[in-house]
A protein has these predicted regions:
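Glycine-rich phosphate/ribose-binding loops and adjacent secondary-structure elements
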Residues: 257-441
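Short histidine
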Residues: 400-503
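Active-site-facing alpha/beta catalytic cores
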Residues: 121, 128-312
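Terminal peptide-recognition signature
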Residues: 134, 320, 480
Length: 503
């Protein structure tokens, strides 16, 4: 049995020409010279190296297609009929609504959230409603790396950013709905640091939280982007980007003019952190005015996982997000999305084991988020339970953006009188059909009726996630999210049982 996809994919546009497949290679078992060329090999034969990355990126998001042999579906959720933990209420008074989902984190500056949910780094598609919906839901959310590349009004002088109006636009999409729960966080990679993104974000635009990026589950290296011509290569280099080959080299210019120059690529810088230089960087961020510092880490080698956690402990980092394989991205190498990193469930187990060792040493651990392929409340509950109290929140990125996009699109259809058939039984207007609008009105008053339906979509989706988690908490007679544990899970396979702690 092969766990990897064939040479067909939803995001490479490749298609095997028939249904008979050779599992080891993913090729058609019968490969003919009469084939019109639709598979990934045919694409590579014509488009070459650019097919390392998806050729379909744009107004979409993409994710791993590998069918991993172990995931959260290998567990069922336990249930109990006796007792009640985490509440002072009498048993005869308790309902599902009594399960407390609110959490708090932060080493120096405490952040409260209404849900054990984080919306991880993103800065494409319907980002306004993604961030606005996060604020309405009372959860923290992260602006993705390289946001500067999305700002047509960006201004740079002497290699440093002096104007970054997109940062203000993002704040304006978040803070009108913010009511004291959650935080808006700006993720910065090595290139962002190089051109001064943290400095201008904190000093000019008033950002209070920075996430330092080590990596993400869909790509363990920074992306390479093909550039159309010499002019674009020179422009990117002037903005501080690494460009290959070097467009300022006279020999490269001459080769380009003669039509004999290889393709240009902008190359993201690798993070080069040590215990010493990251300490200085964090101190600098705090001196600038940052109140909370976060880490974003992928499923790298186990020694690297431990090293990052120890860096977090040593520098009083507020939260570390670990991103496993199986999630998605806006732009990552196709095979890297499928074929690298610990799958999220295995990454979570590794992180928990490391946390146990660090805790034995008496060190204070940061809050920890696990993300990578989560979309429903059963998955969120299982991740929190398997985290044994060390995992304090779950990241929902692609799913929350899907809610922002569909919430916006369906709202527009309703306003045009083109109600999708599935929703026609629920009413004729946005107010009638969007069922959680009364909950938003209870918070913001009737002005919520005028909110963007994309942001309402994110709020409604996260409301559903929280409500579903409350059901599973009540099912196990645990009325506080902090009490969820592995005893609340039933392993269905031997592989799943091996992930459970020894009793």
């Amino acid at each position: 049995m092969s766990y990897s996809p064939t040479l067909s994919s939803g995001f490479t546009a490749g298609r095997n020409s028939n249904r008979f497949i050779s599992p080891p290679s993913g090729m058609c078992s019968f490969c003919s010279e009469d084939c019109n060329g639709t598979c990934e090999i045919a694409l590579a034969a014509v488009l070459g190296a650019r097919t390392v990355y998806p050729i379909t990126t744009g107004n979409n998001q993409i994710a791993s297609e590998k069918d991993y042999p172990l995931d959260y579906s290998h567990f069922n959720i336990n249930g109990r009929v006796f007792g009640a933990e985490g509440t002072d209420k009498g048993l005869e008074e308790l309902t599902v609504f009594d399960v407390k989902l609110n959490t708090e984190y932060g080493s120096k500056n405490k952040i409260q959230m209404n849900l054990p949910i984080i919306l991880p780094a993103l800065i494409k598609l319907n980002w306004r409603d993604y961030f606005g919906g996060a604020a309405m839901s009372g959860v923290s959310c992260v602006i993705g790396e390289d946001a500067r590349n999305n700002d047509p009004n960006l201004v740079m002088n002497n290699g440093k950013i002096t104007e970054f109006p997109l940062l203000q636009e993002i704040m304006d999409s978040y803070y009108p709905y913010h009511r004291g729960f959650g935080q808006l966080i700006l993720q910065c990679n090595a290139d962002d640091n190089f051109v001064g993104v943290p400095e201008i974000a904190i000093k000019k635009y008033g950002y209070k939280a920075i996430e330092i990026k080590f990596g993400q589950g869909a790509k363990g290296v920074q992306p390479l982007k093909r550039l159309k011509n010499l002019e674009m290569a020179i422009e990117k280099q002037a903005m501080g980007c690494l460009v290959h080959p070097d467009p300022s080299d006279p020999k490269i210019k001459e080769a380009y003019e003669n039509g004999a120059c290889p393709s240009f690529y902008s190359c993201g810088r690798f993070p080069v952190w040590t215990e010493e230089n990251i300490k200085i960087h964090i101190e600098d961020l705090r001196e600038m005015g940052a109140e909370n510092i976060y880490f974003k880490m992928a499923g790298y080698d186990e020694a690297d996982l431990e090293r990052v956690l120890r860096m977090a402990c040593a520098n009083e980092i507020d939260m570390v997000t670990f991103d496993g394989a199986g999630g998605g991205s806006g732009y990552s190498p196709s095979k890297m999305m499928n074929e690298w990193s610990y799958p999220t469930i295995m990454l979570e187990q590794k992180v928990v084991q490391i946390c146990k060792q660090i805790k034995k040493e008496g060190l204070l651990l940061p809050a920890i988020t696990i993300t990578g392929g989560f979309a429903s409340e059963d998955q969120v509950f299982k991740a929190l339970a398997l985290g044994e109290g060390y995992i304090t929140s779950v990241g929902l990125c692609r799913a929350a953006m899907a809610a922002a996009m569909t919430g916006q699109k369906i709202g527009a259809q309703i306003k045009e009188g083109k109600i999708p058939p599935i929703f026609q039984a629920f009413g004729k207007t946005v107010e009638e059909i969007y069922s959680d609008l009364p909950d938003l009105c209870a918070i913001y008053g009737k002005q919520a009726l005028d909110f963007s339906t994309g942001a309402i979509g994110v709020f409604s989706y996260l409301h559903k996630i929280g409500f579903g988690v409350q059901h599973f908490g009540a099912l196990n007679r645990k009325f506080d999210v902090s009490l969820f544990h592995t005893e609340d899970l039933i392993p269905l396979t031997l592989e799943a049982e091996k992930l459970m702690p020894l009793k």
